[in-house]
Amino acid sequence: MNGTKFLEGEEETDVGLVGACVILGLCFLVGTPGNLLVVWTILKHVKQRSHTVLLILHLAIADLLVLITLPLWIYSLAHSWVFSEAVCKAMVYIINACMYSSVFLITIMSVERFVAVRYPFASAGWRRKQALNKLLVVLWMASFALSIPVIVTHTLDGPPENVQCTFREYTSDTQEVVLLTLETLIGFVIPFITLVVCYGCLFSRIALMNFKSKRKSTVLICSVVVMFGLCWIPHHVMNLLSLAAIALKTTYPKVTENLEDAHTTMTLITGALVFISSSVNPILYMFAARTFRSSLRETGIQKLFQHISSTASAHGNKELSFVSKRQNSHTSTSQCLTETKLPVDLTMEAL
């Protein structure tokens, strides 16, 4: 939310605030119990967790940390910010860090799947070294480091009776350009290009999957990626509008004014979409779990995560067995035949 409130203008304020509160309220009511269910199910019922399930767990935690702040934002929009500026900065800092984490986790899901299919031996090494835990530590540290600028720029503003924690104050146009460019490049452009490349390269492999159950985790992750794009593109389009307004401020002041008006009008919508991205993933998991038969003691989503982990575990044993056989083999023909078959098997097995 860059430098403006959700909505300005006396005639539109009431409608905008009501709309914002309704959207954010729905995000909280749907996303919070949904992500809690995901976290509880994985921690309680999935003992052997594949890389995919671990990434989903961290994604649910990041989304949950964002969503639990929504009641305070709703109250603030409806009335006024009641806490200090330090609390405002701290909350926005945590939200930004968790949103960076969500973006990076979704990106890693795609890269990990790409490596597992296209470079199976590298994937085997990844699993043996248990590098994912170290990568997750680096990911969270990077997310909190990249969010430091909001501590400097975020501030309280507005009339005394309606102070809001939705403003960024930049010391110069240069600072704004640098920070918005970094946010869009690191937080969206690079991750989204990575997602497109990974799934573009895997498209032909995914098309070979004949059994719906074996395609489940791939379709699930693809759905998460698509929703990620739909929810985040508008936010970064607003960043581009801000950059364009700065670039044209001197030569085309009228165009700059129109861009700023468009930015102000769209901020409510883009802000709501960002929070929707944190609440929609559990819905996707439940939709993917709908075909799993469940007993009285097991839920469909529990069966989904167990299925993903069990197929990954079974595949990992198969892969390591293949590596061992390949090292002991003395015929290049058999090696070639086996190497040709493995990527297809990898694609057909859910991570």
Show where each model-derived region lies:
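Intrinsically disordered regulatory tails of 7TM GPCRs
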Residues: M1-E8, V137, P159, T250-N258, ...
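Extracellular N-terminal segment of 7TM GPCRs
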Residues: M1-P33, L37, T171, L180, ...
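Loop architecture of class A 7-transmembrane GPCRs
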Residues: N2-E11, W81-V92, N96, Y119, ...
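Extracellular TM2-ECL1-early TM3 structural module of rhodopsin-like
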Residues: T13-C21, G25, H51-M109, A116-W126
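Hydrophobic alpha-helical transmembrane segments of polytopic
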Residues: A20-I23, C27, L132-L139, V224, ...
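Hydrophobic alpha-helical segments of membrane proteins
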Residues: I68, A145-V152, V189-V196, V225-A244, ...
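Class A GPCR helix-loop hinge within the 7TM core
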Residues: M99-V137, L202-F203, A207, M286-R293
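Intracellular effector-coupling site of seven-transmembrane GPCRs
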Residues: L135, T166-D173, E183-F188, G200-V237, ...
